């Protein structure tokens, strides 16, 4: 008989965590004070300037002799996934790329501090895939789906050839179905041993992007593209790339009955994720 799943309640009846290592970690963060959160961020060196051009931070900025030694100790490589996309007049179009790289740079700094440094690869997609309703959006550059998939497949193949057996995409953009398809096609095509996965980091911490009166956040809406929550993360990581004087208050309009499609992080548990349909 399967073991019954246990849940960890919070001070908000709508928020609970699974009684698992991941759920217990999230519950600990949920209950942490602002001072404790600041200490955790300090452990990861967040905020810090972008390290895309810093020696020793990425595979591509590290002497090969040193990178080989690093990989022999830890063959996990994180691959940041971003894009070039309109995020409103107040934000930079490279927001997704800078957000995910600077988060992962914090992970690398922390793992180096504890003596088990992971590796980071340069973002393979500075321009990404997009849904149909993004066509014609100024500031957004759209690549064909097959280009996205094949770019990711051959990125994985090159990293595998270099000895990395645990390749993890960390996605900061909405083209998740393309990443999933790339991983499955890579495994079918080459049938190589390893662990290959993609993580939607926003969904991974969806509870913290859900408005609540009990946990001290001031969000009016759950996380969605270019909103107050995403902007707040940008202000933490790269404040000088944002111009809040140009920010505009705006609300989406639904053309279907309410309750059909969910938001970016599926926080409402609705029947369909946002990407499971198109039309006009």
Mark where each language-model region is.
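Extended, histidine- and acidic-residue-enriched regions that form the cofactor-binding/catalytic faces
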Residues: 1-166, 172-280
């Amino acid at each position: 008989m399967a073991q019954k799943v246990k849940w960890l309640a919070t001070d908000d009846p709508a928020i609970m965590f699974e009684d698992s290592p991941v759920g217990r970690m999230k519950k600990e963060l949920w209950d942490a004070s602002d001072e404790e959160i600041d200490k955790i961020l300090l452990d990861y060196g967040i905020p810090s300037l972008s390290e895309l051009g810093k020696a020793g931070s990425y595979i591509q900025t590290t002497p090969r002799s040193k990178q080989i030694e690093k990989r022999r100790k830890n063959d996990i490589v994180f691959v940041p996934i971003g894009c070039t996309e309109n995020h409103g007049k107040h934000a930079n179009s490279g927001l997704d790329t800078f957000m995910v790289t600077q988060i992962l740079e914090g992970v690398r700094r922390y793992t180096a501090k504890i003596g088990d440094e992971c590796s980071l690869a340069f973002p393979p997609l500075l321009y990404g895939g997009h849904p149909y309703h993004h066509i014609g959006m100024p500031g957004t550059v759209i690549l064909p789906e097959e280009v996205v998939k094949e770019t990711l497949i051959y990125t994985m193949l090159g990293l595998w050839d270099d000895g990395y057996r645990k390749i993890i995409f960390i996605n900061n953009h909405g083209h998740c179905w393309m990443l999933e398809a790339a991983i499955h096609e890579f495994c079918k095509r080459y049938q190589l041993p390893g662990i290959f996965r993609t993580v939607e980091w926003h969904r991974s911490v969806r509870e913290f992007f859900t408005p609540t009166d009990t946990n001290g956040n001031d969000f009016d809406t759950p996380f969605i593209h270019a909103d107050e929550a995403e902007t707040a993360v940008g202000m933490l990581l790269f404040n000088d790339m944002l111009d809040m004087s140009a920010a505009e208050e705006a609300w989406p309009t639904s053309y279907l009955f309410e309750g059909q499609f969910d938001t970016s992080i599926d926080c409402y548990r609705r029947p369909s994720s946002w990407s499971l349909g198109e039309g006009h």
